[in-house]
Structure formats: C-alpha cells, structure tokens
C-alpha cells in the first residue's frame, strides 16, 4: 500500500547551504521530519549549483519519511546572474538596470521550461521577458 501524504512544504533555499536553522527547521520540525537528513540530501543534490536559490517541494508522509523535488531557480535570479547585477530596478519602467539579448532570453527560457506553464520555448521566452521588464531590464534583438 502507498504511503499516505501528510503535507507538502515548499521552500526556496540557497544551493548547498541548507541548515536546520529557520526557515527549514520550523517548517519541517512541525511535521516530525529528520531535519539533518533533509539538509544533507539537499546539500548533496545542489552542490553543483552553488550561489543559486533552488526552490524545493518536500512531500512529507505519515511515517515521517519524505521525498523532495528540486525546481529550477527563479527567473529573476537567472536574469540577475546573466546580467551580473545585484538587484533589479526600484523603478522598473523609469530606471533601466541592463539589457538582455534574445539569445540570453532563450537560454533562460530553455532552463526554466520544465517549471513554467508553457508548451514551447517561444511562450516561455514571453514569460521570462515579462519578468525581465518588471525588473527594469530591456530586451534587445
């Protein structure tokens, strides 16, 4: 018989830097999960993505066991990394902080495609372009 799912916890954690401190400890502790086991597994699976924020969806079962699925980093983080900037614009439609080329946009869209609500890369590019615009980033051809 399949294990009964008790909860699904979604967290955004720095890759390779999961610790039992908040926000991870309280989120998993209230469900009785072995926090150190999760931290070790997460850090091992995300060691190659150091410096990125990697969202994770943790499924917690009745017997206090868990499984987790790693998602792709948020589009805003990928855009900031591509441009080499610290943060987006505080006034996105007035102050521009940089510009992305179509090739960079396509690369980010292809990376995010599995997690986006899009059927093809063109639709994913439109979603990423919208995120970029809201950060004060222009798209150039």
Swiss-Prot record:
This is Large ribosomal subunit protein uL11. InterPro entries: Ribosomal_uL11, Ribosomal_uL11_bac-typ, Ribosomal_uL11_C, Ribosomal_uL11_C_sf, Ribosomal_uL11_CS, Ribosomal_uL11_N, Ribosomal_uL11_N_sf. Belongs to the universal ribosomal protein uL11 family. Keywords: Methylation, Ribonucleoprotein, Ribosomal protein, RNA-binding, rRNA-binding. It comes from the Bacteria. It comes from Synechococcus sp. (strain JA-3-3Ab). One or more lysine residues are methylated. GO terms for molecular function: large ribosomal subunit rRNA binding; structural constituent of ribosome. Part of the ribosomal stalk of the 50S ribosomal subunit. Interacts with L10 and the large rRNA to form the base of the stalk. L10 forms an elongated spine to which L12 dimers bind in a sequential fashion forming a multimeric L10(L12)X complex. HAMAP family: Ribosomal_uL11.
């Amino acid at each position: 018989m399949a294990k009964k799912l008790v909860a699904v916890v979604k967290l955004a954690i720095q890759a390779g830097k999961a610790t039992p401190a908040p926000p991870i400890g309280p989120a998993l502790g209230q469900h009785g999960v072995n926090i150190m086991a999760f931290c070790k597994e997460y850090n091992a699976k995300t060691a190659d993505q150091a410096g990125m924020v990697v969202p994770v969806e943790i499924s917690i079962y009745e017997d206090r066991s868990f499984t987790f699925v790693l998602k792709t980093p948020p589009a805003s983080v990928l855009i900031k990394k591509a441009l080499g900037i610290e943060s987006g614009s505080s006034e996105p439609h007035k102050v521009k902080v940089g510009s992305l080329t179509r090739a960079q946009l396509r690369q980010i869209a292809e990376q995010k495609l599995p997690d986006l609500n899009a059927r093809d890369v063109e639709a994913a590019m439109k979603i990423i372009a919208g995120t970029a615009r809201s950060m004060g980033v222009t798209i150039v051809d």
